[in-house]
UniProtKB/Swiss-Prot annotation:
Organism: Desulfotalea psychrophila (strain LSv54 / DSM 12343)
Subcellular location, principal: cytoplasm
Keyword Protein biosynthesis: yes
Protein name (record): L-seryl-tRNA(Sec) selenium transferase
Subcellular locations according to the entry: Cytoplasm
Family statement: Belongs to the SelA family.
Gene (name only): selA
One Gene Ontology biological process: selenocysteine incorporation
A molecular function GO annotation: L-seryl-tRNA(Sec) selenium transferase activity
Modification N6-(pyridoxal phosphate)lysine, positions: K293
Recorded GO CC terms: cytoplasm
Source organism phylogeny: Bacteria, Pseudomonadati, Thermodesulfobacteriota, Desulfobulbia, Desulfobulbales
Amino acid sequence: MPKNNLLRTLPKVDESIAQLRSTGVAYSSDFVLKKSVQTCIARERQGILAGKITEKRAEDSWHACFLKELKERQAPNLRRMINGTGVVIHTNLGRSLLSSQVAERLAQTASYYSNLEFDLATGKRGSRYSLVEDTICELTGAEAALVVNNNAAAVFLALDALCRGTEVIVSRGQLVEIGGSFRIPDVMARSGADLVEVGATNRTHLYDYEDAISEQTSMLLRVHTSNFRIIGFTSEVPAEEMVGLARKKNLLTMEDLGSGSLIDLTSYGFPKEPTVQELVKAGVDVVTFSGDKLLGGPQAGIIVGSKSVVERIKKSPMNRAFRVDKFTLAALEVVLRSYYDSRQALQEIPTLRMLTTGKDVLLKRARRISRRLSAKLKEKCTLRIVPTMSRVGGGAFPEHDLASWAVAFRPEHIRLSEIEKRLRKLNTPIIGRLENEKFLLDVRTIQDDEVGLLCSLLLEFFLEAS
């Protein structure tokens, strides 16, 4: 059919909306209905003009197109997903999960007024930071604490408040870059501090710092290289030695710990990483770390240290630009209180629970999934339970893999790349990985309470796909 004739067959927007209404479409917004119809018609018009569409679309096909577009517009942009990648602190999938206790507190905080900045004892204005400061100090041993909206903000704010217009000395091997092109030298430049690099990429000694100290120096900075490792002929200055030098020269010390952990995980097979408490005990004046990585909480940047130094940071005009809201504080308080008992924290905090779950528990979970799917999918795909390796994620423990189990799918009538693509487009997307000619779902990051949903989605998908 000629293009002009095809274009004349395109439905009218108002008539299409009226038809949708007459068939009982339960959506009150004319704006969304109109946008859905216009999008479908515009897409059809483009196809006709490009020569890709040469036949008139059937009436019932238009109706289906409108409904599909409307459904997609109604779906939330930020949606639930099932993480079968095995990456526990997956930055692209939202980093740390929060527990049901946290979700309950967040719902209460959202639905009712709260004492965010109201002192219940005096009836006067209070400070939002006091809601979690005492708890952070009790857990870390610090004299004072401040919470901002992420660790990059924490680093910037500390440098801006303490070091603007002065020199900060840092090892060349610690000038890290993390996700989103966040580079320590760039942050220092924006904060107004002048960077002084010392040492070599692989080795830095105490005398390197001492030789670089001048009248303009205000701080010795350590940046924990949590997202990469330099191995072989290496050397770095321990926090205790740096603190000793700084005190002798009347300088401040600061550690950007990055992921930041309150629990030593070496008993669970992890390499030794410094905890926040250890750095505070070593006398570091300021320690910054993330809330949504190894801590297992909401996105936040936590600053701890000596009272006099943290108070200077609190008074910075930039503090207000980085302040956290009531939801972050509500979630963080619940997470922090779990740490009063480390065994409780390992069970209640999803991130820690996933990181420390044993292989036997993971194998049982994999078998549960396999039992539900194998018999019904035997003609559609081959299922196997295979050993695999999970990752911590979040820029933590870059060299440490976690032994795990995965359910591996090898389909009979559909390409692996097509499986990955189509599972990603489900209403509840399922994200896995392609490995050794199989589609793998690592069960470490699949929660027990979503096994049923996962199996239902997979059954529906494979039985329809052919």
